[in-house]
Amino acid sequence: MLALGRSTTPALDLLAEASIAAAAAHVAGLGAPRLVIDATGFLHGAGFTPEKSLRDLDAAHMAHAFAVNAIGPALLMKHFLPLLPRQGASVFATLSARVGSIGDNRLGGWYAYRASKAALNQLVRTAAIELRRRAPQAVCVALHPGTVETALSAPFARAGLAVRPAAEAAADLLRVIAALGPDDTGSFLDHKGLPIPW
């Protein structure tokens, strides 16, 4: 197992494609990966909070949300999907969010996060089609881990939102990943392996 991030060697910064390419080259030197998990995301921080209304939209916040939640993962797919072996089972899984479901949006708000995760879901679906042509047994999926006890969810947990321990969420996602097959590629699934509407 190898974990990569901004503070690792090599560093991997979603906002810098050169670092993504360098990280992929490092991984390629270790052999073809059978499992790649992208566990990144941005909801709030640096003075930005989730929007409750159109009045709250901020171009810089939206651009950053799309950069981290959609463009960065797309660049990870660009550089890491080609590393998956052409034969045999392999998985690229990225963490999405149920709030990125257009069909399941009943509450509104959280414009930048919702839209950027919906964009991620489309990118996963599209990349899965291309991946299948090269590696028919490989799977590319978007996974919703549930609301997990992290810095991302901390402000909302204090407000009474039920959160799950990170270890529990990770174990659930690994069970879902272990059960994936080629027919699941391009799917958007929750932590129980159930499909989420697009």
Give the positions of each predicted feature.
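Rossmann-fold cofactor-recognition segment
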Residues: 5-22, 26-27
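Conserved mid-core alpha-helix of short-chain dehydrogenase/reductase
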Residues: 19, 64, 72-79
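Active-site loop/turn elements of alpha/beta-hydrolase fold enzymes
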Residues: 6, 40-41, 97, 145, ...
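Hydrophobic positions on the long internal alpha-helix
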Residues: 76-80, 84, 123-124
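A glycine-rich helix->loop->beta "capping" turn
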Residues: 26-40, 45
